[in-house]
């Protein structure tokens, strides 16, 4: 860390087999095909290593200047073969820790057997330090299996 980066926001992702930061603003971070960190991300000094072992899941985090930024995160809830992608624009505050945590929202199903058989929605909480400040959920569409992450009221 440098004196300038002490005020950076730290961004983490967790909750799944693996998660990767795909892009921060225009800077590509981790390649989706080979799962390698881009030279640009290293040159811009936004990538940090959380643990000693790069082979551990979720070993990377970002250290970024405060302000409004676009972030794209790939979560792998079941396996590393299938990613769920979240696009977020957020105003990050200086020297704060932000964690994007994916989970499956357990719900009491009501209605038809078809609706009841659908998997529970995938959700991502954005936590600032320990407090959840935003939530995005991706309901399962019974007809085509596809859905988009939509911000929920907290």
Write out the residue ranges for each language-model feature:
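Short loop/turn and low-complexity linker motifs enriched in small/turn-promoting residues
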Residues: 1-66, 74-154
